[in-house]
From Swiss-Prot:
GO BP term, pick one: selenocysteine biosynthetic process
Function text: Catalyzes the attachment of serine to tRNA(Ser). Is also able to aminoacylate tRNA(Sec) with serine, to form the misacylated tRNA L-seryl-tRNA(Sec), which will be further converted into selenocysteinyl-tRNA(Sec).
Record's protein name: Serine--tRNA ligase
Keywords, sorted A to Z: Aminoacyl-tRNA synthetase, ATP-binding, Cytoplasm, Ligase, Nucleotide-binding, Protein biosynthesis
GO molecular function: ATP binding; catalytic activity, acting on a protein; serine-tRNA ligase activity; transferase activity
Reactions listed under catalytic activity: tRNA(Ser) + L-serine + ATP = L-seryl-tRNA(Ser) + AMP + diphosphate + H(+); tRNA(Sec) + L-serine + ATP = L-seryl-tRNA(Sec) + AMP + diphosphate + H(+)
Entry EC number(s): 6.1.1.11
NCBIfam families hit by this protein: serS
Family: Belongs to the class-II aminoacyl-tRNA synthetase family. Type-1 seryl-tRNA synthetase subfamily.
Organism: Streptococcus pneumoniae serotype 19F (strain G54)
Compartment annotation: Cytoplasm
CDD domains: SerRS_core
Residues the entry annotates as binding L-serine: T230, A231, E232, E284, S384
Amino acid sequence: MLDIKRIRTDFEAVAEKLATRGVDAAVLNEMKEIDAKRRNILIKVETLKAERNTVSAEIAQAKRNKENTDDKIAAMQNLSAEVKALDAELAEIDAKLTEFTTTLPNIPADSVPVGADXXXNVEVRRWGTPREFDFEPKAHWDLGEDLGILDWERGGKVTGARFLFYKGLGARLERAIYNFMLDEHGKEGYTEVITPYIVNHDSMFGTGQYPKFKEDTFELSDTNFVLIPTAEVPLTNYYRDEILDGKDLPIYFTAMSPSFRSEAGSAGRDTRGLIRLHQFHKVEMVKFAKPEESYEELEKMTANAENILQKLNLPYRVVALSTGDMGFSATKTYDLEVWIPAQNNYREISSCSNTEDFQARRAQIRYRDEADGKVKLLHTLNGSGLAVGRTVAAILENYQNEDGSVTIPEALRPYMGGAEVIKP
């Protein structure tokens, strides 16, 4: 959530920044007018209350003097009626301002490339060289079916489109991947957490999914509960409405969880395979940091995600997202895109973002600065470390052999009971 004080004091700069995220200037101008009206009403209310207090004191004095107070009582009643009417108007204005501040996206950092969409993203670096095959590489969905480890047909029968069963060494591979990821993040100082997979609406508001993106989630009807779209939600809200000790920052959390997404608006996109599912496993990284340290922590988090891909020897690139392509809560985002041979393309496998104090303001997560004793909003960061299903897809395609088998990456073999190859 944006700081209304920053919008007031630096309106032109904020408007210019948000314009790069597709926010119409008319929206901010309307918000500015409503905010000015609110402040004028507050002044009127305070003036009327002061007058009412004066009249009240005059009534008390008149009664002590046994004087007639009818006119003064009538005047006080009129003042009270005016205050009540203005308070009602103020409540309506506050609701409107809240609607603005909770649905406007975060302000992009100065270092973020300016652009309307993915076409303006900037590649930062690449790692690894895509393998040259001496045969036509298969898509991971065909490999998975031929190996008998991925079953979309029965997933569709049991549930519907974009669901599947992992079987045998496919299930073992999925489990090996996320255990490997959690172990690697643990070495980097992350505390492993098992979170609730259902959260309440306040938690969804805290991280920015609600109210703007309700259509992308699976709500439990007639309840206050939602299936989590990412472990970012419960991990970040772990400290909601709390004041942390500054000397304990930064704090690192990691968790593996299922993620549930309706994929509204994704009709026709990635209809086959593991790239876009309604339910998938993901290992998440979340950080709580002091403002002056958060961008250094973003670089470290991105490196933590890269470490997984490097140890799996999967070629990838790091991309800085443009202002128009970033997520709602982010001030800066790096995407990691892994090489998918059958698509001859890099595909997203991780997003690492700094939200600065955007989520912390919504969730009221603060810290007491040990330097001056003041309570301040901290910065929150989140990143995929990594999307597990997409990692399965990348391994199947990059490690496939001409006979249809798939070699298991060396880093995963201790997690696979010593298995080295998945054979038809």
